[in-house]
A protein has these predicted regions:
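Membrane-proximal, proline-rich intrinsically disordered regions
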Residues: 20-64, 240, 303, 388-389, ...
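Short, surface-exposed recognition loops and adjoining beta-strand edges that mediate ligand/DNA contacts
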Residues: 33, 60-74, 154-163, 201-283, ...
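Conserved, well-structured interaction surfaces
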Residues: 79-152, 179, 197-200, 344-348, ...
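Inward-facing hydrophobic residues that define packing positions of alpha-helical scaffold repeats
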Residues: 105-108, 185, 192, 240-241, ...
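Short coil/linker segments at helix-helix boundaries
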Residues: 121, 125-130, 151-187
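Extended ligand-binding clefts on enzyme/binding-domain cores
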Residues: 213, 230-353, 398-432, 449
Length: 476
């Protein structure tokens, strides 16, 4: 029966499930704990949790400084409002993300609460398979907690506002207070360390190799994300040991446009299924032409023609400046090339194999190990056939270079949004085609932390709203 798990899970992920609200009892038969009676049904339930995981990298990238609008951006009314940081759009986003993450956590909990009694009925081989599943579930839960913390709590260094997010271990609805940021971080670390240990000892998953599922390397990379969020540089260096190949080659680089189609495991440590509508905001669905793309890249992120990433990361276009002048224009190409060719991607990358390189390089530089940091990042740039960071760049300039290269690599994948917040950097947005600065969001703006949504404010134990946001979010 186990040989049927892989195709079944892929089918379930492709179909997608309608996630329930935090306030609605579990009705999905796949996540009903009483329906989990075997390894196979446990994996079916876990697939529902994977599907519930929010897919908002594009909208978070709009809130960062990854994109600049084109003159067609206004044809999609919600994206320009989000790009302009309107309170209404931020409230809508907070509601979507809060419910999406906690639906995923609820689905994970439905699996975890059933495992102890199920384990006693299984053979030794099935127990190892169940152990692997448990590690996946804990990793997914930790990822949700980390992203909730980054979105709904002030920066980790802000000791004046210690409130984090709600930690939930039960399936049933319950009113709980927000734990502190430190308590949440400790829980995330515990979940990931337990998962990493189990991944190491339990062998391979029962369903074989599937790109939409988590494993040991993904768990370690998420742990590195947690530690860089906390400013634990030595911890980042420690956990990224073994995640980076001794020889960094072009094999890490999605060079072909088709490499963005289905979460290729050569590049993905974790990829998430997406609905076909996911990409509709970045282009105008009715035309499927380059001219219909709503957002372009800022010029500082342009890739050189000889860079191996150019072919798949970039859509080349031309901007008419005036009657006699044009200039090259680079539009985001990840996934978009496929859409322009009328081919819809089925998964998006959430954790990529290249990410530990940039996490480790930053951590090394911050510990004064600048030569090691520069050598590491330049090895990746060399594989990309991109210009290296100069030996003369040290100190703050070296850190700026590393973060700049990280943004060029992961543009549109939401990582920049989290980096700008933890680094305390302002967000600068532009009018179409970078003609002028349209908006600057300083590091201390209340808009940098999403509000606890209205749906959760009925929780009598939730405590104060996030700084700067009205307690009644219906206010204009």
């Amino acid at each position: 029966m186990l040989q049927l798990i892989r195709p079944l899970l892929l089918t379930l992920l492709a179909l997608g499930f309608s996630a329930c609200s935090l306030n609605i009892p579990v009705e999905n038969e796949l996540t009903d704990p009483n329906a989990i009676t075997s390894v196979q049904t446990a994996y079916e339930a876990l697939s529902s949790a994977y599907t519930s995981y929010p897919k908002e990298a594009y909208r978070l990238s709009l809130l960062s400084d990854d994109f600049v609008p084109t003159f067609t951006a206004g044809q999609d009314p919600s994206s320009p409002r989000l790009y302009s940081y309107t309170d209404a759009e931020l409230r809508d986003l907070s509601e979507s993300l809060w419910q999406g993450y906690y639906e995923t956590i609820r689905d994970v909990n439905a699996v975890l609460v059933r495992l102890p009694s199920l384990r006693s009925t299984l053979s030794p081989q099935e127990r190892r398979q169940l152990d692997y599943l448990e590690a996946e579930a804990k990793t997914l839960k930790a990822l949700c907690y980390l992203e909730l913390l980054q979105l709904f709590a002030t920066p980790y260094s802000d000791t004046a506002h210690p409130a984090g997010i709600i930690l939930k271990d039960r399936v049933e609805r319950e009113e709980l207070p927000r734990s502190t940021k430190a308590e949440v971080a400790d829980r995330i670390e515990t979940l990931l360390n337990e998962a990493i240990t189990t991944f190491t000892t339990s062998g391979t998953p029962a369903y074989g190799s599937v790109p939409g599922f988590l494993g040991r390397e993904a768990a370690k990379t998420i742990l590195a994300r947690l530690r860089i969020y906390q400013g634990n540089w030595s911890g980042v260096e420690e956990v990224t040991n073994g995640l980076i190949p001794e020889q960094i080659t072009r094999a890490l680089i999605p060079q072909q446009r088709s490499d963005w189609r289905s979460g290729d495991q050569r590049f993905a440590l974790f990829a998430s299924t997406v609905p076909s509508s996911y990409f509709s905001r970045i282009y105008l669905q009715e035309s499927n032409k380059k001219g219909s793309l709503a957002y372009q890249l800022p010029q500082r992120l342009y890739l050189e023609e000889g860079d191996l990433r150019h072919h798949s990361y970039i859509v080349d276009s031309t901007l008419t400046v005036d009657a006699t002048t044009t200039r090259a224009l680079q539009l985001p190409g990840k996934y978009v090339h496929l859409i322009l060719e009328r081919s819809t991607p089925s998964l998006t990358y959430v954790v990529r194999r290249a990410e530990p390189i940039f996490l480790r390089a930053e951590a090394l530089a911050r510990q004064g190990k600048e030569d090691e940091a520069r050598t590491l990042i330049n090895a990746y740039l060399s594989a990309c056939q991109s210009a290296p960071i100069a030996p003369s760049h040290t100190g703050a300039q070296l850190l700026e270079d590393i973060l700049h290269e990280k943004q060029r690599e992961f543009v549109g994948e939401a990582l920049r949004f989290y980096d700008l917040k933890r680094l305390g950097l302002p967000i600068v947005h532009y009018s179409p085609n970078e003609t002028r600065i349209s908006l600057t969001i300083p590091a201390d703006s209340y808009k940098r932390t999403l509000p606890i949504p209205l749906s959760e404010r009925s929780n009598s134990r939730i405590g104060a709203q996030n700084p700067g946001w009205p307690d009644n979010l219906r206010q204009p």
